Amino acid sequence: MEHLTLGPLTRANGTVRLPGSKSISNRVLLLAALATGETRVRDLLDSDDTRVMLQALRTLGVAWRQEGDDYIVTGAGGNFPNKSAELFMGNAGTAIRPLTAALALQGGNYKLSGVPRMHERPIGDLVDGLRQVGAVIDYLGNEGFPPLHIQPAGIRIDAPIRVRGDVSSQFLTALLMSLPMAQSDSGRIEIEVVGELISKPYIEITLNLLARFGIEIERQGWERFVLPAGAAYRSPGEIFVEGDASSASYFLAAGAIGGGPVRVEGVGMASIQGDVRFAEALNRMGANVMAGDNWIEVRGTERDDGRLHGIELDCNHIPDAAMTLAVAALFAEGTTTLTNIASWRVKETDRIAAMATELRKLGAVVEEGADYLRVTPPQPWQTPADGIGTYDDHRMAMCFSLAAFGPLPVRINDPGCVAKTFPDYFSVFAGVTG
């Protein structure tokens, strides 16, 4: 197995230009494909997950081309040319879930599959929602999980659609992105969320981008959404992809731990991403934070001992970036408790279990629950002989790069898994640390 040994690191300072947001990139690609007209997408993330979406769209007959760093997508006007296709979705939840909903409305024959871990990630609540409007979707493996077979069906909407919100916000996102194409006698479509909606900021991203493509959705609290029926998606002509706020978290945390200043560019206070609020959490831990519309800068604490301090935080608003806090907690005085993170269980790996296991290898005392993690720093630090496992999870690898600020070197196993969202992460990280 390939591995990378880092540290011990003693400083962090510099400026990082962030790659595009994964969440925004794949949403924009699908919306551009469904729209009428040509869309020029600037600063699209170049990663495994976006390549999966691009390949799927090409297989479905959607034309796109690359011009320099831009991607130009020729929209299909809501009707994919190819009505039969087998699509391999890798481990890209931001691709398979919205595409499942879009394809259910296409009147075609489609099969969607992925890597083994994808076949363990739930999709049943989305399928249940689509079946309510007449979609015909069969499971080809275990009930409630991919792979899927979507068959031609007559879609009818004559009642509110109910979807669970407490497992993944991507189910709701998928319905919001595709159901406006459907017809309804009333001219409107209602979606009711069952249970507490998690990861609300990701729904804000979806609503914001839909508006850019001409689809205005009425949100009534977080329990009900009213969509236009029979709507036409219109290309905005050109759209910029923000820098990835989740990826920003590793560099901002490095600034807090390693003294800084570390500045990230491409995301700031004008961002539509919830993970931008990660900087607020660092500030609560004692770091110095400055920000503008398109940048954030972090320096270490001004305490005499230079240490951050532990906090208790409801992480529903920063579900991905909260992972970074779990590793930053190694460098804080006292215990850090992260709550409302149940969605970690159904990500690229069971992130609560994986994070707890690897933090303990470094000597931390960790308590894990169904939806929380409690971390007390190591006394003393330990170096695991077998290195830090990354579980084929890009965020595990990037998070644990921060452990290199400890007093001992740290070995990251399978560092190449960062290709899912940030292929050159470790070289960029090396450029601002030492």
From Swiss-Prot:
<dbReference type="InterPro" id="IPR006264">
    <property type="entry name" value="EPSP_synthase"/>
</dbReference>
<dbReference type="GO" id="GO:0009423">
    <property type="term" value="P:chorismate biosynthetic process"/>
</dbReference>
<feature type="binding site">
    <location>
        <position position="169"/>
    </location>
    <ligand>
        <name>3-phosphoshikimate</name>
    </ligand>
</feature>
<comment type="function">
    <text>Catalyzes the transfer of the enolpyruvyl moiety of phosphoenolpyruvate (PEP) to the 5-hydroxyl of shikimate-3-phosphate (S3P) to produce enolpyruvyl shikimate-3-phosphate and inorganic phosphate.</text>
</comment>
<keyword id="KW-0057">Aromatic amino acid biosynthesis</keyword>
<keyword id="KW-0963">Cytoplasm</keyword>
<protein>
    <recommendedName>
        <fullName>3-phosphoshikimate 1-carboxyvinyltransferase</fullName>
        <ecNumber>2.5.1.19</ecNumber>
    </recommendedName>
</protein>
<feature type="binding site">
    <location>
        <position position="347"/>
    </location>
    <ligand>
        <name>3-phosphoshikimate</name>
    </ligand>
</feature>
<feature type="binding site">
    <location>
        <position position="23"/>
    </location>
    <ligand>
        <name>3-phosphoshikimate</name>
    </ligand>
</feature>
<feature type="binding site">
    <location>
        <position position="22"/>
    </location>
    <ligand>
        <name>phosphoenolpyruvate</name>
    </ligand>
</feature>
<feature type="binding site">
    <location>
        <position position="93"/>
    </location>
    <ligand>
        <name>phosphoenolpyruvate</name>
    </ligand>
</feature>
<comment type="similarity">
    <text>Belongs to the EPSP synthase family.</text>
</comment>
<feature type="binding site">
    <location>
        <position position="320"/>
    </location>
    <ligand>
        <name>3-phosphoshikimate</name>
    </ligand>
</feature>
<dbReference type="GO" id="GO:0009073">
    <property type="term" value="P:aromatic amino acid family biosynthetic process"/>
</dbReference>
<dbReference type="GO" id="GO:0008652">
    <property type="term" value="P:amino acid biosynthetic process"/>
</dbReference>
<feature type="binding site">
    <location>
        <position position="27"/>
    </location>
    <ligand>
        <name>3-phosphoshikimate</name>
    </ligand>
</feature>
<feature type="binding site">
    <location>
        <position position="121"/>
    </location>
    <ligand>
        <name>phosphoenolpyruvate</name>
    </ligand>
</feature>
<feature type="binding site">
    <location>
        <position position="199"/>
    </location>
    <ligand>
        <name>3-phosphoshikimate</name>
    </ligand>
</feature>
<keyword id="KW-0028">Amino-acid biosynthesis</keyword>
<comment type="subunit">
    <text>Monomer.</text>
</comment>
<keyword id="KW-0808">Transferase</keyword>
<feature type="binding site">
    <location>
        <position position="395"/>
    </location>
    <ligand>
        <name>phosphoenolpyruvate</name>
    </ligand>
</feature>
<dbReference type="InterPro" id="IPR001986">
    <property type="entry name" value="Enolpyruvate_Tfrase_dom"/>
</dbReference>
<feature type="active site" description="Proton acceptor">
    <location>
        <position position="320"/>
    </location>
</feature>
<feature type="binding site">
    <location>
        <position position="170"/>
    </location>
    <ligand>
        <name>3-phosphoshikimate</name>
    </ligand>
</feature>
<feature type="binding site">
    <location>
        <position position="351"/>
    </location>
    <ligand>
        <name>phosphoenolpyruvate</name>
    </ligand>
</feature>
<feature type="binding site">
    <location>
        <position position="420"/>
    </location>
    <ligand>
        <name>phosphoenolpyruvate</name>
    </ligand>
</feature>
<dbReference type="GO" id="GO:0003866">
    <property type="term" value="F:3-phosphoshikimate 1-carboxyvinyltransferase activity"/>
</dbReference>
<dbReference type="InterPro" id="IPR023193">
    <property type="entry name" value="EPSP_synthase_CS"/>
</dbReference>
<comment type="pathway">
    <text>Metabolic intermediate biosynthesis; chorismate biosynthesis; chorismate from D-erythrose 4-phosphate and phosphoenolpyruvate: step 6/7.</text>
</comment>
<dbReference type="InterPro" id="IPR036968">
    <property type="entry name" value="Enolpyruvate_Tfrase_sf"/>
</dbReference>
<dbReference type="GO" id="GO:0005737">
    <property type="term" value="C:cytoplasm"/>
</dbReference>
<feature type="binding site">
    <location>
        <position position="170"/>
    </location>
    <ligand>
        <name>phosphoenolpyruvate</name>
    </ligand>
</feature>
<feature type="binding site">
    <location>
        <position position="168"/>
    </location>
    <ligand>
        <name>3-phosphoshikimate</name>
    </ligand>
</feature>
<dbReference type="InterPro" id="IPR013792">
    <property type="entry name" value="RNA3'P_cycl/enolpyr_Trfase_a/b"/>
</dbReference>
<dbReference type="Pfam" id="PF00275">
    <property type="entry name" value="EPSP_synthase"/>
</dbReference>
<feature type="binding site">
    <location>
        <position position="22"/>
    </location>
    <ligand>
        <name>3-phosphoshikimate</name>
    </ligand>
</feature>
